[in-house]
Amino acid sequence: MSHLTTFLVFFLLAFVTYTYASGVFEVHNNCPYTVWAAATPVGGGRRLERGQSWWFWAPPGTKMARIWGRTNCNFDGAGRGWCQTGDCGGVLECKGWGKPPNTLAEYALNQFSNLDFWDISVIDGFNIPMSFGPTKPGPGKCHGIQCTANINGECPGSLRVPGGCNNPCTTFGGQQYCCTQGPCGPTELSRWFKQRCPDAYSYPQDDPTSTFTCTSWTTDYKVMFCPYGSAHNETTNFPLEMPTSTHEVAK
């Protein structure tokens, strides 16, 4: 076999392996209103009308990644504008994280033990109901999860903001809520979120019940906004306009 042929075979195998190893993410809007989906560090952003999907690929090793939805946005032809919830610096294609409140899907691909780590988090608050999980469930904690409770409608008065339910750290600050220095535990407010979304992260060290894993290399994922087709599984009155009154997966 010539050196050229050997190189071409090696290149083809490397390309196929890399392509196969890349995680495919589908982000689907099932809400009865427009959602401006966002994803970093891979993806950027996309406007999704009801029933539309957006696909992107995240390479192995992608970490500290987030997917979320933005509401009540207005962008010009150059992709500059503003969103009421989840805004990421006034651009359509996000380069950084969104401004709370926003319901988060978080993931890190191909980490230790050849596992993907992923979760739903309400540490940054809540704006849109969400489900997240592998397209083909596997053993153990490789199955779909959701956060679809009527959090906006039941939000405590101290956390209510237009279009969402804010998080205690942004609202009050301090170690008790932000958990930035050493160990910390749940608070009354984080328990309030946890009761409504038991699979979701409710405070930064909520790992035991909120981190999910799937085998790397072969797993694709789907994020769905409003999996029940409305605000949650009981009402269609969403998004709610309310009077005005960060955890990281495997690094």
UniProtKB/Swiss-Prot annotation:
Keywords: Disulfide bond, Glycoprotein, Pathogenesis-related protein, Plant defense, Signal. It holds the Pfam family Thaumatin. GO terms for biological process: defense response. Glycans are attached at residue 233. Coiled coil: none annotated. Transmembrane segments: none annotated. Residues 1-21 form the signal peptide. Induction: By tobacco mosaic virus infection and wounding. PROSITE patterns: THAUMATIN_1, THAUMATIN_2. Disulfide bonds join 31-226, 73-83, 88-94, 142-214, 147-197, 155-165, 169-178, 179-184. Belongs to the thaumatin family. This is Osmotin-like protein. It comes from Nicotiana tabacum.
